Amino acid sequence: MSKRTEPALFLAFLITAGLSVGGLWLLNRVSPGLIPGLSSQTAPLADGNSTNSQQKIQLTILGDTFSGYSTFRSATFQDALKESGISLRYEDEFDQAKRVTRLNQGQADLVVTTLDQFLKQKPAGKIVGLIDRTVGADAVVLNTRKYPSLKSLLDLNQVVNQARANGRSLGMTFAGDTPSEYLALVLDTKFEAFNLQDFEINKVEDASEAWKQLQDPNQNVAIAVIWEPFVTQARQQGYTVVLSSKDAPEAIVDVVIASNRLLQSQPQVISEFLEAYYRRIDSNVRDGSQLQAQIAEDGKLSASDAAAVLQGIDFFTAAEAQEWMTSGTLTRRINSTAAVLALTGRLNQVPQKPEALFTSQFIARAANNTKTLVDLVRADNPALADRLSGKGRAIAPTQKLTVSQVKAAPAIGNLQVRGEVSFGVGSADLTPAGEKTLNQLVQEINEFNTQTVAVRVIGHTSRTGSASINQTLSQQRAQVVVNYLRGKGIQHNIMAEGKGFNEPIPGISPENPRNQRTEIRLVRIN
């Protein structure tokens, strides 16, 4: 071989090697993970605002086994993230306080949790995305099988007093630091006949344990708060589902929280993470069967149980999440949730600036993608377009019921009236104080689903004067309340009912002015 050919051979070798390395790099960028070992190097939170580098960004997200978080655990979603140069590690951390501590200490970048836990635990971060609302997945179940007279919250006092007379106390069970506990707090603050202090509280690790305790004939459990698929099983076995998250569809909201560290060092990563997540959600909205299959596989559930779980979860699209963040809806939910926590001693102070707790900045790209998709499908599939826009279930009109239908509907319980619905002496004219009380009640009633909950306004008088006059006055007062609530925008089926002085408060004289009262009773209609 002549020495003249050696430089040419050497140059050819360099070109071949360069093409090989370049080809492998390009293949790895287009199809991450196709060639083992090439994508194994990760760098947590590299400096800069873009993931367009050869370093892969490693994100750690903390959550639990809730089916609403199954997308974050799915291989399909994690593979999609890798195409953006993001490697996601999902870890279960069931202790909510530890979950936030790890975020604050830099051991995690993101956390998924409920809005109430976000307010309670106060992480060093902000809400950057909304995941879902539970719409039936969580429920309060009464042990009607053991206590046949226990069919609504109105029956609690009698059952509790009977147990005490026999030297026993009744129990209540739920999974602590979960939506089940928050739903119990909602009962405690919203309904006058329910008081957590009346029960021996048994907090368990999982709803499956609460469900077992409710069924155990040797336990004196009167109430359990559980989630699907146990809610469906309880209903099928004759227990009373007195209130579910479907009745209060905005009470339990799951959120994505980004650490302040991630917000400051890698804002672009958050946008790309959310863009990939909501793209997956949009796909699931178009074809719900793949999400059901994902939930079944993730939770090792049967197809029917997975369907029950999915039926109770309403996932946010990016467009809807953005609308919540920018229209004031999320601010109102924060205020309402904080009020429940404060009233039950779980929060010392309601946030003064709730708008500072979240940002819509990082969801903008994902929302624009969803809006583009809505425009594309609107003409051919308006129902899908509505669902992608965040309407869907919410746009169904309220079914109008007759007075007799509302009156015959099974009771849930009486709302806690903070203040007095007062009238002029001997008249049906509301006082300013009475109007103020009703204005507060408008907000309370609007928390409940018009599709599943109706309202009975029941007027009572004290025993002074003739029965007929008192009957007429109580009916007139109840009707005035109904008219006032309707005038303030209440869309629920609502009816007025006068009782005169026929149902005095137990334990006080029928002539006592305290009998002059107005009950706001919620009943189940659907």
Q: How would you name each of these model-derived features?
A:
Residues 25, 161-195, 276-312:
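Ligand-binding clefts/hinges and TM-proximal coupling segments of bilobed small-molecule sensing domains
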Residues 115, 197-200, 207-300:
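Pocket-lining segment of extracytoplasmic ligand-binding domains
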Residues 460-526:
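Periplasmic OmpA-like peptidoglycan-binding domain that tethers envelope proteins to the cell wall
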Residues 365-454, 525-526:
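Periplasmic peptidoglycan-binding/tethering modules of Gram-negative envelope proteins
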Residues 44, 266-350:
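Secondary-structure end/capping motifs
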Residues 1-17, 24:
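N-terminal Sec-pathway targeting helices
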Residues 134-146, 239-240, 252-256, 260-261, ...:
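Small-molecule pocket liners
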Residues 31-196, 202-203, 225-228, 250:
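Short, glycine-/small- and polar/acidic-enriched structural segments
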